[in-house]
Amino acid sequence: MTLTNQMDFQNHFLAKDLHRITKPKKVGKRRHTDESNDEDASKPRFMPKTLSKLAQHKKQRQPQVMGQKLSVSRIIETLDQESLQNLISNLVSEHPEVAPTLLKISPQVTIEDSLMVLEQKLERILQNMPYRVDASSDYSFLRVKPHVEDFFQTLSDYTLNFLPPIESDLTVPLMFLMKFLAKCFPRLPKFHAVEYRYYHSLTVDKFNTILDDILVQFLSEKKHNIILAINQDWLTDFRKISELNDNNFSSVYERLKQEIDQYENPDAASGQPSTNNAGRLTGLANLLNFSSDNSPLHGNTVGNVFDTI
């Protein structure tokens, strides 16, 4: 091979090597990695203190809305009648000293309110009566005995509340008893149990005393009161009341009839002696007591129970 041919052969392979693709060296990447390591090393390390500041920052960004309990007025507005009644009862039990204040600021109980409560308690008696059993049997009475006792105790409380000197308007006790005896009292079951018959007989006896006394006081209080009784036809009302209650209040009817006859015929009744009813209700608060402690089965009643039945 000549010298010229050798040079051409070398140039051929040299040109071929120039077009060969070779892998890049990792010198630059290594240099970049080293620089990154140096940069990370120069940075401060992550400390727990920074995390605490971050948590504190997040906490400060939360809305500052705190919960609170309902006010007393809102609670009272929300409660139903039974819940409110239990609340006041518990309050008086825990703090008896608030009872006088409660009585002082409480609204006056009306006749309609009292009759509504008594009718509700009567409905409880009737709704709890056993089925397919004689309504007058002792078993029926025992089933509703707590409701019966509650009814008579409530009746006693309302009646005494409407009597003088608590109530100065004599028409209030008259209207209360007349409406009660016409609408509520006749609907009571006629139990044969001795305890119930005692309660019932005691009620009839004391209501006769109350009505007779209050009626005479009312008619003698003002001259035009007898005209009011005539115009409102009280005589018919008392006659119906007596008929609805097995004629147990016929004496009150006769008393009113006598007063009206005396007013309409003063000459015919001038020779009849007047009855003095002053002080007839003295001690009635002790006698008109339907508490379960005064039950004939407890032996705490005045006199012989069977004398009043």
Curated annotation (Swiss-Prot):
GO terms in the biological process aspect are: nuclear protein quality control by the ubiquitin-proteasome system; proteasome localization; protein transport
Sorted keywords for this record are:
Cytoplasm, Nucleus, Protein transport, Transport
Name its cellular compartments: Cytoplasm; Nucleus
Keyword Glycoprotein listed? The answer is: no
Q: Name a GO molecular-function annotation.
A: proteasome binding
On whether Cytoplasm is a keyword of this UniProt record, the answer is: yes
Domain of life where this protein originates: Eukaryota
Task: Mark out the compositionally biased spans (Basic and acidic residues).
Answer: 32-43
Q: What is its main location?
A: cytoplasm
Q: Cross-referenced Gene3D superfamilies, in alphabetical order? A: Tethering factor for nuclear proteasome Cut8/Sts1
A GO cellular component annotation in the UniProt record: cytoplasm
Residue ranges of region Disordered? Answer: 20-45
Record field: compositional bias (Basic residues): 21-31
Entries under InterPro entries matching the protein: Cut8/Sts1_fam (IPR013868), Cut8/Sts1_sf (IPR038422)
Family, per entry: Belongs to the cut8/STS1 family.
Q: Main role?
A: Involved in ubiquitin-mediated protein degradation. Regulatory factor in the ubiquitin/proteasome pathway that controls the turnover of proteasome substrates. Targets proteasomes to the nucleus and facilitates the degradation of nuclear proteins.
**How would you summarize the oligomeric state and partners of this protein?**
Binds the proteasome.
Identification of the protein by name: Tethering factor for nuclear proteasome STS1
- Which source organism? Ogataea parapolymorpha (strain ATCC 26012 / BCRC 20466 / JCM 22074 / NRRL Y-7560 / DL-1)
Could you tell me the gene encoding this protein? STS1
